[in-house]
Amino acid sequence: MCGIVGVVGNTNATDILIQGLEKLEYRGYDSAGIFVLDGADNHLVKAVGRIAELSAKTAGVEGTTGIGHTRWATHGKPTEDNAHPHRSETERFVLVHNGVIENYLEIKEEYLAGHHFKGQTDTEIAVHLIGKFAEEDGLSVLEAFKKALHIIRGSYAFALIDSENPDVIYVAKNKSPLLIGLGEGYNMVCSDAMAMIRETNQYMEIHDQELVIVKADSVEVQDYDGNSRERASYTAELDLSDIGKGTYPYYMLKEIDEQPTVMRKLIQAYTDDAGQVVIDPAIIKAVQDADRIYILAAGTSYHAGFASKKMLEELTDTPVELGISSEWGYGMPLLSKKPLFIFISQSGETADSRQVLVKANEMGIPSLTVTNVPGSTLSREANYTMLLHAGPEIAVASTKAYTAQIAALAFLAKAVGEANGNAKAQAFDLVHELSIVAQSIESTLSEKETIEAKVRELLETTRNAFYIGRGQDYYVAMEASLKLKEISYIQCEGFAAGELKHGTIALIEEGTPVLALLSDPVLANHTRGNIQEVAARGAKVLTIAEENVAKDTDDIVLTTVHPYLSPISMVVPTQLVAYFATLHRGLDVDKPRNLAKSVTVE
């Protein structure tokens, strides 16, 4: 949520800021702004809406130093007054901020009596506080910033400019992502390496409660007490071509189409030349040592955990429990004696999951992060990491990351099972079976026109819909319903088909769309009984079935794949259902309202 970009020492500062903010659009925002300095001249430009609207207002704005921000409203409505950057009382200091300041009202009452505020944000309180300490109390800029940081409670990533000294950006963070980008003769600040991919692939991490003084030719890292911290840079393996849409109208469609390639990349990443599964032995041992696996995640990643639960349990001989990170952060249940926490997060920055990880580290619980972003916070702070190798996922609605998460966990389960001598794991030819999955997805993708026609007939005008399934198909139904509701705004719920008669069937009326998923030969006929129940009450039914359970009347038929991997192939047509339903409603597929790609506040 939200994004920060900053640059010092580059004559193309405005262009760098705008292009950086464009690359952060996927994170979600409702307004944006930049502040640019060129010597004594400075320019503050804000806009509500898209970056294109901000860019149109920056003609003639030039400078060598600046900060930019995309805002997702948490305090105050999306207006230009509330958009960042914000200025201090005298307008000398300018600040952008991601996160939530928990004690901003206390700060306002205790320190800022008589100050005049233009908006209703917690960020404006912070920059006024810094300004007060520097201009009213006579502290140096650095000491004023430090004093403010000691007072402020909450999550934050700050980038501060002193208009009287345009050669430096002051940066600090706590529980919110922020990086330093290292350029040739200039340096940068960004929430995400993707924002600066055009400028550099060299980055420096900032840890919690660290302050960084960024100049064109130097970067100095300190703790809040002024003690220097040594920090090496690292290279981010990102490709500029990966983050473009190419010939696609939307990122989501591109990312759906990339899924067969992602499956094959995972095979390459987690097998050796002989085709044997290769996982870090330390990760295998961590799973072997655990008496219970706890998967912590949110949203789509949570659903991927459910879809992987049976496979993990059967192949590793270890019980698996699922937890919603936002719930566990405030109330961790009674744990087993030797737990292992697995965090699933596309971005590796999910604030709710990090809150749990911090507690796990304090308790000495071993942890594994499964993420798409190397060097992300969850990756750095967990004991172990498995990467998804899916490439940047830009669309807010996750597609390829979900399928990659299940596939990555399959490699983990296979490796641990083989190490344990588990017969099912030894018989599970994952490389072969995942190759079949890739082919199945390609076959589904070739039927886009057929799927689009069925979606137009079923969903174009409806306000409600249901997905149903049993077993693994129920977990896919959960993800399918989330995908449909989050981008098409159709109120959709995913249910275990057997639960219909326990209440949900009361919502079925003439014309209600019900989408049924069938892949398990043992359960398919039971689900077909539920289909008959809803059809008898007037529901319009669309069935998605694997060949081994398909009937001539089914609408979408998929290649049969291994049961452990069926959630990967079964979810793809539901992704297309969501895409086409949204497209034919004239909505923005990639940027649904009120949602952010990376949820970095609790």
Curated annotation (Swiss-Prot):
Span of domain SIS: 283-422, 455-592
Regions of compositional bias (Basic and acidic residues) in chain numbering: 77-87
Subcellular location: Cytoplasm
Limits of the Glutamine amidotransferase type-2 domain: 2-217
A Pfam family annotated for this UniProt entry: GATase_6
Keywords from the named record: Aminotransferase, Cytoplasm, Glutamine amidotransferase, Repeat, Transferase
NCBIfam families xrefs: glmS, PRK00331.1
Subunit and partners: Homodimer.
Entry protein name: Glutamine--fructose-6-phosphate aminotransferase [isomerizing]
Species this chain originates from: Streptococcus pneumoniae (strain ATCC BAA-255 / R6)
Taxonomic path: Bacteria, Bacillati, Bacillota, Bacilli, Lactobacillales
Gene name per UniProt: glmS
